[in-house]
A protein has these predicted regions:
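Hinge/capping helix and adjacent helix->loop/strand transition within the periplasmic-binding protein
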Residues: 84-90, 105-192, 240, 253-286
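Short coil/turn segments
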Residues: 42-43, 97-98, 126, 134-139, ...
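C-terminal lobe and pocket-closing loops
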Residues: 211-279, 309-312
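N-terminal twin-arginine translocation
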Residues: 1-6, 14-28
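Short beta-strand->loop
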Residues: 111-123, 159, 181-185, 203, ...
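An extracytoplasmic/periplasmic, membrane-proximal ligand-sensing/linker region
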Residues: 31-33, 177-178, 216, 264-326
């Protein structure tokens, strides 16, 4: 005979069992290896930063955080692999402002939607691009470049590592704001571009901080940094704003993203741990050697805001240059 008391007892037992299964299914995050995708090949600033971050997070989270290189299509392949992963916090990706703001403007077919398929977790690092010229160049200031370009239209060249790269667009923005024209020369690598620049075959180039050793050695001459404030690695080099381009503020920045719909509590935990690691003095010091700084505001909301601002800045330039990659 089944009594009311029996039913209540059975129901209580069932609830307890369900709670046990639920607790097991929702084990504290993380309980296994986390994958951090770098959407570029090994080497460079992204690799150094990722290695430092993975070491710090592995220690902090008590679970391995490992690097997974997935290069191709200007970073789109690696980011897409994470965008299509399970939204559980175990697949993360380093995204750059080029991927988030320039790629959607120049690629005719994006495999993912930067606004819908990714969840910003934290801002990571920032660095200024550096306007460099050959050491024997007659240019010693922005005014020198502008005067030469206006006196001899069409003779100046600027290099970048690819059509549609942030370096190309920085050069185009520089030309527009100064009312001059320059011929863009795309290269397959930064090494190739810098070799020709050192040899005097190119007039100038916006490059990343990996060129700082060449500047320190006197093989290249730095005329300006592109951010709104001077670089602590090159404190003697003025900003473009200091030389008359008041609205020129171009930085390269990295952020960490997860697939869209990653649970908020997991995103918040990851953001807190990333912020903790990146706030350490030793972490900052190792990056500063490279000319790179930790983002002053690491909140996820900053990623979304900067995306919107930079898409508005680059859209008219990309449109006018008719840059399209199939």
């Amino acid at each position: 005979m089944i009594t009311r008391r029996t039913c209540i007892a059975a129901a209580a037992s069932s609830l307890a069992l369900s709670a046990t299964h639920l607790a097991r299914g929702q084990a504290a995050f993380p309980n296994r290896t986390i994958r951090l995708v770098i959407p570029y090949g090994p080497g460079g600033i992204a690799s150094v930063y990722a290695q430092l971050l993975c070491e710090g997070l592995t220690e902090s989270l008590k679970q391995p955080v490992v690097i997974d290189y997935r290069a191709g299509a200007g970073g789109n392949i690696g980011v897409d692999s994470v965008a299509k992963s399970a939204p559980d916090g175990y697949s993360l990706v380093i995204v750059t402002n080029s991927i988030l703001t320039i790629n959607p403007l120049i690629y005719s077919k994006m495999p993912f939607d930067v606004n819908k398929d990714l969840e910003p977790v934290a801002m990571s690092i920032v660095y200024s691009n550096i306007l460099v010229v050959p050491r024997d160049s007659p240019f010693n200031s922005i005014a020198d470049i502008v005067a030469a370009a206006k006196a001899n239209p069409g003779t100046l060249t600027h290099a970048s590592t690819a059509v549609g790269s942030s370096a190309q667009l920085a050069g185009e923005l520089f030309a527009r704001q100064n009312g001059i024209s320059m011929l863009h020369i795309p290269y397959k690598s930064a090494t190739g571009a810098r070799t020709d620049l050192i040899g005097g075959r190119i007039s100038l180039m916006f490059t990343d901080p990996s060129a700082i050793p060449l500047i320190k050695e006197g093989r290249l001459k730095a005329l300006a940094v592109s951010a709104a404030r001077r670089s602590p690695s090159l404190p003697e080099v003025p900003t473009l704003a200091e030389q008359g381009l008041k609205d020129f503020n171009v930085e390269t920045w990295f952020a960490i993203s997860s697939p869209a719909n990653t649970p908020k509590d997991i995103v918040q935990k990851l953001q807190a741990e990333i912020t903790k690691v990146q706030s350490r003095d030793d972490f900052k010091a190792k990056l500063l050697v490279l000319g790179v700084e930790v983002a002053p505001d690491m909140r996820a909301a900053v990623v979304s805001q900067r995306m919107r601002d930079e898409q508005k800045m680059w859209a008219p330039i990309v449109r006018d240059l008719k840059i399209t990659i199939d």
